[in-house]
Curated annotation (Swiss-Prot):
There is a cross-link at residues 981, 1154 (Glycyl lysine isopeptide (Lys-Gly) (interchain with G-Cter in SUMO)). The gene is SPP41. The keyword Phosphoprotein applies. Interacts with PRP8 and RAP1. The lineage of its organism: Eukaryota, Fungi, Dikarya, Ascomycota, Saccharomycotina. A motif (Nuclear localization signal) lies at residues 683-699. This is Protein SPP41. Residues 211-223, 235-249, 367-383, 665-674, 692-706 have a biased composition (Basic residues). Negative regulator of PRP3 and PRP4 genes. Residues 27-42 have a biased composition (Acidic residues).
Amino acid sequence: MAYDEDDGEINFNELVGNLLSSHNQEGQEEGEVQGGEQEGDDFEKIYPTSENIEPKHPDDSQHMHNSPDQNIEIPHFVDEEDELVSVVANAVQNIDDEQAKPENHLENGSEHVTSDTADDNHEKEQQQEWAHILQQEILKSDGEPLRENTERRVSTSQHHPSQRTDDALDQDDENLRMAILESLQELNTNEEEEKEPEKHEHAAPNDKLSSKKSSKKKKKDKSKNRESSKDKSSKKSKSSSHSKKHAKDRNKEKQSKPTNNENTLDLSNILENLIHENDNAAIDTAKQTVDIQDNSHTDNTNNEDVEAQALVEATLKAFENELLSSAPTEEPSQEQSIGPVSSRKAVEPPRKPTADDIPLAMLQAFKPKKRPPQEKKKTKSKTSKAASTANKSPASESTSKKKKKKKTVKESNKSQEAYEDDEFSRILADMVNQVVNTSLKETSTHTATQDNKLESESDFTSPVQSQYTTEDASTANDDSLDLNQIMQNAMAMVFQNQNDDEFDENIVEDFNRGLGDLSVSDLLPHDNLSRMEKKSVPKSSSKSEKKTAISRRASKKASRDASSVELTEVPSKPKKPSKTEVSLEKKLRKKYVSIANEAASVARKKRWAKNKELKEKEKLERQTAREERRHKKKLEKQRLAEEQEELKKIVERGPPYPPDLRLTKSGKPKKPYRRWTPEELLKRSQEAEKPRKVKKERKKKEKKMKVPSSALKKIPLFNFVKGNVQPSARHRLNDIEGSLSTIGLHKSPDGVRRILSRPKSEDHEWPLSDSSASQNYDAHLKTVVHKEKIPFHPPWTIPSQPPFALPVARRKKIPNIKKYRKRTNNSFRVSKEGTASTRNRILPAILLPIINTLKAAAKSQTAAGATPEEARKRLATIIQHAKSTVIRAALQARKNSMQAAHSKGTTTELATTASRMKNPLKMIPIFNTSRVKQQLDKQLPARSAGTEISSSESPDKATPDPHSNSTIAGHTLKGVTTPIKIEDSDANVPPVSIAVSTIEPSQDKLELTKRAESVEPVENNVETAKETQSVQEIKENVGTKASEEVTLTEDKTNGDPKNEKRILIESPVEKTDKKKPGEKIATDLNEDASLSDKKDGDEKSTLHSDAAQLTGNEPDSVNTTTGKPKLIDVSLKPLNEAKPKIPIIFPLKRPQIKPEVSVINLVQNLVNTKIPEIKNESVDLGSNITDILSSTITNILPEITATDVKNYQYEDENVKYLKKTPRQVLNLDGLVPPSGRCITKAKRVRRIKKLSADATTAPEADGKANSESITYTFDIPSPEEVQSKRSVVLKFAKARLTEAELSCLKKEINNVRKRRWREMNSTKNWEYDVKSRLKKRANAFFGEGESETKSKWIEERFQEKVSQEKYKDRLETTETQANNTKIVIDDKEILNILAVNMNNLNKARCIEKDIQESFREEKLASLQPKKKRKKSILH
């Protein structure tokens, strides 16, 4: 809206300036001014008639502008004149836009009458204000400089005789100008004094804003200028509609008031004010105008054609509007933007203004603008300089004319109805035709001169404008009318014999009101309107700036020509051929629009009602459907609940279940219980019939073996050794020998000599000449291969001199893939010596050859392709052979060492050997000895009739006692009686002691230092014997040589002298000789006695003999006789030469022995347990065999003292075994090779076992067995009394225990049941094991086949094993339990498990109480059987 108001302000300013300048130029007198006012009044009265002529103006103006007479040179004017010319050009164009609107409103006039009459009163009030503002602006802008400008223009116009049409229109211009000024003066007289200061405030900001906008938009390019011209024209057309309404008001005032010459304006004062204002504005912007003028000059040169055309159209329309609408005082802010409008501006259709928009636009025109006043001067100076260079105006005029012509065709169709019924229009058309005909004759003489001008300026036209000029070239000569002549004739005819009284004032007002809102935009298509209105707002300011570049002369000429052409060409516009098509449609629309609207409203209401009903219906349907769904869900829920209840009852009854019940894979009903639907049953049956898809086994891709390069190097190219390949594999190889024979190698030294001696010329012939000769290969000759000696050849052929081996190329070192961490300073480095020592600790030296043998055997077996079972059997046989070899080697080594020690016969050597054996190597057993423990146990209970000899100290120390247990060790080492238990088949034989008859009386003088101490009971000895981890059964030849060996062992216990013991053990080992056994023994004993006498002076120590006491099961069996033992001569007792089995202990761990337990006791116990086994095997041994065995074994074993036990490091301790790289070990029988990391063994707590009360049986009880031994007594009824198969305890436990406790109790019951099952099966398993081993032994003796002797032997051996008491009990229990396949745990045991295992005695007692109470109630109820029967019958 603001841009529209600015355009309106510019129009008035430019129009008045143009009129004033023409008035001063001609110097008209006062009378002429009055005549002009009279003419203006007349024109105002006939304003409606001239409005009808308007729609054809654009076409007429185009014809006139295309005529060659319009190409007149425009003189160069100064800046002030250019400013006035631009003002007039803009004003005239804007007024023409205003006149385009009324025609369109002829059709819609009836619609706007009510709105216009309502606003008339308000607009009249505004007119007086605007008139006052306009007058003040004219006084300011059109001051004294206008006189000087007009004088200059007169002088310059005399130098240009070509513009002879200027003088013709001066009189008309003056008349019109005076009419306008008079109307302004009359409107403003009443309120001039009140509104004057207020209007000054409004004008100043408007000037700033317009000048600011124009200066900014000057810089835009040519394309933007063309687009902006459309917007400008639309806004001007809007403003023109306002001016027409105000003109109607002024017409009323003029008819009521007489015209007074006294009210005319003083033109000299107006010019002075204008000059004064322009000078002040120019001073402030002097510096800026220079740059902007240069820019505008360049822009205007590009847009000259467009702007010239716009100027012509603007002047034409402005002059015509001035004729028709007396004094347009609509937009009084005159000094707003003075910029030019582009050529496309007038063509663009503006928005159609409504009755509401018009007063708002008028009011907003007076809002203060913020643009500074300096910019107004800037734009004026720019446009004035650019206008001086405008020489291309005719060419540019043709473009806008053509566009006007095209658009007015549409306008004519819309305005045909208005022309049809208007008689006044027809009369005016005839009059104009007459004027045009007369003017054609006068203007025909000017065509020749204007053609020359058009040709000279055609070079400057733009490409776009040249297209339009060529199209209009044919009509240019036809329409070359003199606008000046047409206007003069038209005015003369219009105002001839016309009086103001003849016209009815109401008719004029109605006609003006009908045309008030008509604009060009109403005649254009709406799609063009919408597109152009979007562009109109932002580009309006730039378009107003582009008109000032056109010279004053061109604008004058254009205005005259346009006005004359428009008046003459109007009558030819209305065309009736197309009137019927459009008007019929519009008439029908107007006729039936009310009926159609009424029908549409009725139909709309019906549709609303119908839609409402449909929505209600849909809502009800949805609601019913929702209720149905809910009901179905509820029924389904109830059905499922009923089915669940039914199925629960079925499940509680137990199997068999119905076929449609869902079951798990195990056959139990699946929760939640559900039946299969018929569809699911059908599907399951079909799936069962279908064959199952066989899953394809994915074949694992075999990984390609990576052959190392070192192996590839070793592959020979040719196998020259014929016998190297097996005959079976010869057919797989290629024909290597055949290929070698074709090569022609020289295999003899003669051939090599010939190669060296042959001339070079024979090189190419030599291989072929000697290839047929057979040569032998000499392996001693080496071929030195160089790369250059082997010529290049195809790979499928053999070179002339092939090498015997490939050259070995140097290879780059392959980087180590495995990255080792940097060794830190704190890391422990293990040396080779350390690894060797740790290996020796873990693996004794005796086992290394065995292990290497086993490894080699395993490698050979696996290399041969044997299966793991075959390799295992092979290694088993090797281990069996290794056993016997190791036993033989160990026996031989010990025998040799004993013989060497005996031959030397020195106690020092014996002491050193004993000290060496104190720290033996840790031995790892090669074979299993797990049955040794059982063999030890099975012999102890059978021997209950053993006797014991205890030594007593003599009361008289001086008297020697040959039968006493203590002797003098200083004189003899062998004259000591050693009490030994001789186990014979006879249990009543008293114990004997072996003594020597040669005892000197001097021995009685020595004192006895120690008293024999009794040994701990047999139970301790048996337990310590069991704790030793391994026992080896070794065969030893006892009868090879009779020898006696004395071993000195010391037992030191915490340094206590009381516990110190010096034990002399006499263990003569005799070799029986068939000829003289007694003699041999006697001589040996005498020799040993003489050796011991020599050692007596140095030792000076008392020896004490320790008697081993063996006790049976009963304490009464211990014999404590103090009588003299019977001497038995060794020579009298026959000795057997058989080789008995003697068990020797090789400890894996250091035995855990109490300090008071001596080694000799252990040895004697072992011997005593093994001798009966030997006797059972029908081996005849001497009575002194136990003595021999115990002495021999004691010599082998080292002494174990308390300090040794204390200082000994067990394997349990945390010892780190560090190894860099573990030795590669074959994974035999699933054994995992040791890892390379340090393995820290977990420290095990040594468990001390308590001795059981019965010494014959070893404690085998488990931890859980011990816990079961603690039992409580519970008084609950037996299952027979309760008469229930199920456990009553569990039934009552559910009420007392939580779920977790109940599940735990069930687990404990299960564990006890399983443990009992294993115990019951262990005896059976032992029986099967014994029978299978006996069968293996029988197969070795009797062969694989079955025979009576074989089965009889197996049965006998088995009965011998079973006859022992230990196994009798087991067999009896197994026989009783054989029938009971189930292991039943009764209720009392369950309560014990709850009390002991779960540590919950209180709840066990509560359950016991509950069971008793329930049992009592049942008994009471059973006393009344009749009532129960009646109830049951009724029930």
